[in-house]
A protein has these predicted regions:
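Flexible, low-complexity segments enriched for small/polar residues
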Residues: 1-211
C-alpha cells in the first residue's frame, strides 16, 4: 500500500493508515484459533492492570519485580530484545517469542506478581518526592460485592472487554462466594471479595494470553 495506493501513488500515508485500520484481521470477529494471540510480557501485565484499574505508580520496585520474570525495563540482554523472535511454545511448532522468557519459575512468579499488586501493591520510594508507590483501585467492584455474579461480569468487562470464556465466570463466582460476607456486608468484606475476583481473573492464562 505504501508503494502503490491502488492509484499509482507512492507514499500515501492516509491510504496506509486506512488499510491498517480496515484490514480484515483488525475489523473481524475475535479470533478463536488455539494458536492465535501472544503471551503478554511481564511489563505489559503490570501496565495493563494499572491502566485498567485506574492505578498509580512511581515505578519503585517494579523494575526488580519484572526483572525477576525475565524482563527488566531498559536492560535488554541483547540487541534482539528480551527474547528471540523465532522462539516457540515449548513442545510445539507454534511461534511464541514471549515464551522465550517463560519458565516454570516465572509462571509462578506471574501469579505472585498479580497477587502482590491486587492485595497491597508496593510501598512508595521514600527517596522520591511525592512518590505514590504502586496501587490498584477496586472500588468499582467493591460496590458489587453483595452480588458476586455481577461483580465477576464487571471484572471480565474491565480486564478483557467481556471476552473471557463463559466457563471461567461461574468458577470465579464460586470462589468469591466462598469469601465470608455478613449482612449487611462490611467494607472489609467488599474489598476481600473484589480482590479475589480480580486476582483469579488476572492470574489466569485467559488474561495473560492476549487475543
Amino acid at each position: 500500500m505504501f508503494a502503490n495506493n491502488g492509484g499509482g501513488v507512492r507514499g500515501d500515508l492516509a491510504a496506509v493508515v486506512r488499510a491498517i485500520l480496515l484490514d480484515a484481521e483488525a475489523r473481524g470477529p475475535t479470533k478463536t484459533a488455539p494458536d492465535f494471540g501472544h503471551l503478554k510480557e511481564p511489563v505489559l501485565i503490570v501496565t495493563g492492570l494499572i491502566r485498567a484499574l485506574s492505578g498509580v505508580t512511581d515505578g519503585a520496585n517494579l523494575e526488580v519485580v519484572t526483572g525477576n520474570l525475565g524482563q527488566r525495563p531498559y536492560y535488554s540482554p541483547t540487541v534482539f530484545n528480551y527474547f528471540m523472535p523465532d522462539a516457540k511454545v515449548p513442545g510445539t511448532a507454534i511461534l511464541g517469542p514471549e515464551f522465550g522468557i517463560h519458565t516454570t519459575v516465572t509462571a509462578i512468579g506471574r501469579a505472585n506478581l498479580v497477587y502482590a499488586l491486587v492485595y497491597g501493591g508496593y510501598a512508595p520510594n521514600t527517596t522520591i518526592p511525592t512518590a505514590t508507590g504502586t496501587r490498584l483501585f477496586l472500588q468499582q467492584f467493591e460496590s458489587l460485592a453483595d452480588n458476586p455474579a455481577a461483580m465477576v461480569t464487571q471484572v471480565n468487562q474491565v480486564l478483557a472487554g467481556g471476552q473471557f470464556p463463559a466457563a471461567l465466570e461461574p468458577t470465579i463466582v464460586t470462589a468469591v462466594n466462598a469469601v465470608a460476607a455478613s449482612s449487611p456486608i462490611t467494607d472489609g468484606q467488599r474489598t476481600a471479595r473484589a480482590r479475589m475476583a480480580v486476582y483469579l481473573m488476572a492470574s489466569s492464562y485467559d488474561y495473560q494470553v492476549q487475543r
